């Protein structure tokens, strides 16, 4: 699957490693690290809440990790994990869902990458308006990744209009009858596919 993504325009590969909620596993990340044909960066997508998970991510071949602000309620803990990730050579993607979390992310030292998740964690409703509303809060020098609810080229165009730099797509690719075609559709515009 990773090779299909790489051959059709993806700029990175997101690997679900959370077992409890998403039926992923760390072994998939390890295997991809050693078997993929491309050199695309690998993002470990998990609920990272402990320093040991960062060391584990690095040892397993991850280039980047997801830090979900909603799962890390203590600002100091979020800052410590963010700093350690950078120290270990991992790129932290700090995921936000609302204005409060966005403000928390902006307080981090050396913040370069923020993911705006369009899924409401309380209702699980998805709306691209989340990205449209939060994007203006974030300085242009910070790379913005829109996450969730991205299914069509029209969605990508809509996000490009608010200066989103990249998109993280999962469900639309996994459920597509032709994954290669869907990757090309979503990556053929002014926004990179992650």
Set out the residue ranges of the language-model regions.
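Catalytic cores of alpha/beta
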Residues: 49-61, 99-109, 146, 150-169, ...
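C-terminal helical cap(s) of enzyme catalytic domains, especially alpha/beta-barrels
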Residues: 128, 133-137, 160, 173-194
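Charged helix-capping and loop-helix junction motifs
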Residues: 26-30, 76-80, 126-133
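Conserved anion-binding
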Residues: 37-125, 140
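Catalytic-face loop-and-helix region of soluble metabolic enzyme cores
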Residues: 112-169
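Glycine/Thr-rich beta-alpha phosphate-binding loop at enzyme active sites
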Residues: 1-23, 104-135
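Glycine-rich phosphate-binding active-site loops on the catalytic face of alpha/beta enzymes
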Residues: 11, 15, 59-73, 115-123, ...
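Glycine-rich active-site/cofactor-binding loop and its immediate structural neighborhood
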Residues: 1-45, 50-51, 56
